A protein has these predicted regions:
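Structural recognition of alpha->loop->beta junctions
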Residues: 246-257, 297-303, 347-368
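Catalytic alpha/beta core domains of metabolic enzymes, predominantly
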Residues: 268-270, 276, 282, 287-357
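Metal-dependent enolase-superfamily TIM-barrel catalytic cores that perform enediolate-based chemistry
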Residues: 165-277
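Conserved, mostly hydrophobic/aromatic
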Residues: 84, 90, 149, 162, ...
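Flexible C-terminal active-site loop/helix
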Residues: 48-63, 81, 89, 335-391
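C-terminal segment of N-terminal export signals and the immediately downstream linker at the start
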Residues: 9-10, 32-67
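N-terminal export signals
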Residues: 2-8, 15-37
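Metal- or metallocofactor-binding catalytic centers and their adjacent structured scaffolds
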Residues: 47-58, 74, 87, 92-160
């Protein structure tokens, strides 16, 4: 009943009657997509099903990067992904799984997991807790695959409600911090080129460090711009005293925060750095899901929430609130993703301290129109769900 009360409050009467009719018909008839429904072009329907409710379909989609992307542990020119959709009574929710190497997931593992999901047993998409708890129960891992379903379900339900999720959560989009734009480890010439491309477009840059050329990277960028910088070591620093010395040098050169200085397993060393650092230290690889937060408290000043790590928007929103209650700073980030997953993560942006939501800007083959970055500012669309439109 709480959903109907919300709908009464936020919708025009005509829209409420239409949506209420959809929900009632779904509850009584079990959905009209059973039987003769065919998969959208290029998508594979999950044929596993015990009912006639929600319909899940998916297809692989490789993301092509504008530049070779290098961090302290690998380089790549593409990122494997899987596009997901959930169909219900003429409405479609879109989701996405993106699998950079360190997640340990592949197109094959994601598709295998998705093929085991029986959403047809659910005739009411508003049973979000039940649906996502069921999906989560199917394995101990597969977080990116779970995130794809979570994002698609949130998009679908937001569309049924006629509202974007930032509004459903009671957030003010004007409070979203500026997003960083990421510059990967590269030669000085390429770093200069990437930095020039950012001129006038962003107000803060994120720099990948963690190899033996960190100071060269920062100094090269400083030849072009004096914008504030965030740095991400991706667990690349090996000695805690050297890491701390470098952090003091970074502060002197306009860096405002540091992500994951040392290996996530070295909790004591990361805590030692955090205690002495003049800059806020954020956990990235060290934090995956909500249950991880107690284990990192005291070792970092804040956490980086990524939907592909935490299984999606439901848990991401819970992590924001839990971290705040524990006195931690919060950052929302992304992988290399289309505007689908980036726009989903952006729904959280008004509630966090830092944003790194540039994954869609790093690729050449986006599939959607969604959140925008204008003069470095995140602009959240007023469209319902996660605010995206297929291109």
């Amino acid at each position: 009943m709480h959903v109907f009360r919300y709908l009464c409050r936020v919708m025009k009467r005509r829209d409420f009657i239409r949506t209420a009719g959809i929900l009632t018909a779904g509850a009584i008839a079990g959905g009209a997509l059973a039987g003769g429904c065919t998969a959208p072009k290029g998508f594979n329907f999950n044929k596993l099903g015990t009912g006639s409710g929600l319909r899940l379909s998916f297809r692989p989609y490789e993301l092509e990067l504008r530049h070779v992307f290098t961090v302290s542990s690998y380089s790549r020119k593409t990122t494997p992904g899987v596009q997901v959709r959930i169909d219900y009574e003429g409405y479609t929710g879109y989701g996405e799984a993106s699998m950079p190497p360190y997640l340990g997931q592949t197109v094959e593992s994601v598709c295998s997991f998705l093929s085991r999901i029986d959403l047809g047993q659910f005739r009411d998409p508003f049973r979000m807790e039940d649906i996502l708890a069921y999906v989560d129960s199917l394995s101990m891992g597969d977080n990116a695959a779970k995130a794809a379903v979570d994002i698609a379900l949130h998009d679908l339900v937001g569309k049924l409600m006629g509202q974007p999720w930032w509004r459903i959560w009671g957030l003010d989009p004007a409070k979203a911090p500026d997003t960083t734009f990421t510059i990967g480890i590269d030669t000085p010439a390429v770093v200069r080129e990437k930095t020039r491309e950012c001129t006038g477009r962003f107000n803060i840059l994120k720099v990948k460090v963690g190899l033996n050329n960190d100071k060269e990277m920062i100094s090269t960028i400083r030849e072009i711009t004096d914008l504030p910088l965030a740095v991400d070591a991706n667990q690349g620093w090996k000695d805690r005293q050297q890491a701390l010395d470098e952090i003091f040098w970074l502060q002197e050169n306009g860096v405002v925060m540091v992500e994951q200085p040392m290996a996530k397993e070295r909790i004591d060393d990361n805590a030692w750095i955090t205690e002495r650092s003049p800059l806020p230290i954020f956990a990235d690889e060290a934090i995956q899901r909500l249950a991880d937060i107690p284990s990192i408290k005291g070792a970092y000043h804040g956490i980086n929430i990524k939907l592909m790590k935490c299984t999606g928007m439901r848990e991401g929103w819970r992590m924001v609130n839990y971290a705040r209650a524990e006195g931690l700073k919060v950052m929302v980030g992304c992988m290399t993703e289309t505007s689908c997953a980036v726009s989903a993560a952006a729904q959280l942006s008004p509630a966090v301290d830092f944003c790194d939501l540039d994954g869609n800007l790093l690729i050449t083959n986006d599939l959607f129109r969604g959140m925008k970055v204008v003069g470095g500012h995140i602009v959240l669309p007023d469209r319902p769900g996660i605010g995206i439109q297929p291109l």
